[in-house]
Amino acid sequence: MVRQAQEVHMVPPGIFREYDIRGVYGRDLTPEVAGRVARAFAAYLRRKAPDDRPLPVVVGHDNRASSAELHRAVVEALVDSGCAVVDVGLVTTPVFYFARVHLGVDGGVMVTASHNPPEYNGFKLAHGFGTLYGEDIQEVRRLAETGVTVRGEGSVRTADVIPAYRVALRDRVKLGPRRLRVVVDCGNGTASVVAPQVLRDLGVEVVELYCDSDPTFPHHHPDPVDPKNLQDLIRTVRVERADVGLGFDGDGDRIGVVDDQGRIVWGDELMILFWREILPKYPGAQAIVEVKCSQALVDEIRRLGGRPFFYKTGHSLIKAKMKEIGAVFTGEMSGHMFFADEYYGFDDAVYAAARLLRILSHTDRPLSALLADVPRYYATPEVRVPCPDDRKFAVVEALVRQFKERYEVVDVDGARVLFGDGWGLVRASNTQPVLVVRAEGTTPEALRRIQKVLEEALARFPEVGPVDWGAEVGASR
């Protein structure tokens, strides 16, 4: 039964982002707010349901200090709303996705803030094939604010799905004859409960680095897109003479890679390796590439016979687009890798690691040699520049207009400004109060010139913080 509350419930509107819900625990997110969001999500699911049977919903959480309490509030609210809850407990986000497929459950709530700082938390809401984003997220917000709820006698049962997940990956990914030595850095995040175990199941020798679950993240933040978080992994790979180093983010859906020489393999380079394995099986396949990627990736996809096209960044957006066009694989610079080839299409860093190890296990060549023929452009890392949430999209819209007066611009997601010898990007993050900035040039001089163009454009906006390009600027890719 659907009930319209008479009062308006105060739910912070800023927690509803483009493709998930995030906020500071204790300020934006409390158990009470979690309950309201969960009740609104149950009402959303009821509207989508074909009949009045109990709504099955999988609920999981990451290892953040506040996650277990928010998890309990979500489960309680869903049961009160007539949902048949399957509580999978402490899991990575990909294991949560797997649980929905494995158990045949449409609905899902994952309590996680991914790579945000420790004081944050949030929710990923799932229905059908993918996770909610855009207008669907906003519909849940409106339901929460207006107090629309459903009532019923729900239920809850627990399920340990990690053993089934381990079996699934072991059966799907068979390594070749080469014995691999791998350093695994979980950053004390949730991947600690599954990544080392899965890789050992595959027959890999694992050297563990920060693979104890600890929500304070005492050694470094579990965000492998930031080079400073990979420094211990780089050192350990060199000391251990490992074949590869693998880093995972806080909820296990993003991967960072370090080659045998201790060099960071950026997300677009990693995608080149995967496309070289995948595209020969799908001649002429469409290939989604995000606006942050290197021109080297675009050129390599074309060389392999694929059809690249630029699209927006964001895991929910990507998964929906993949389903729409029947894409077999794509990825993001941030380390999200989406395999529909031989897998389910969702982003799973541990599965991506297994696929990389399969490639390495079938060759005697080191990872550094496999990428030696990729054009060596000069690029910055992804740089996050502070900008208030309520201004970041307006700033980007203004920049798009300004850049178009002088340059060719790809504006599908921010402004990818095209120069004859490189490109520069400014886009608004959908999950943090920052602008994401990146640049690439065919020479160090071209890169520096493009960086200066971006710096000068951003400096016109007083609400935008300074651009700190970091130590990696000018490093050859």
List each model region and its residues:
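Gly/Ser/Thr-enriched, mixed-charge loops and adjacent short helices
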Residues: 121-240
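N-terminal small/polar loop signature for handling phosphorylated ligands or for N-terminal nucleophile
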Residues: 47, 56-120, 197-258
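Glycine-rich phosphate-binding loop
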Residues: 106-120, 237-259, 264, 308-310, ...
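An N-terminal, well-structured beta->alpha segment
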Residues: 2-76, 80-81, 158-180
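Active-site nucleophile and cofactor-binding loops and adjacent substrate-binding regions
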Residues: 85-94, 264-267, 289-290, 311-312
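Phosphate-binding and adjacent anionic-ligand microenvironments
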Residues: 282-477
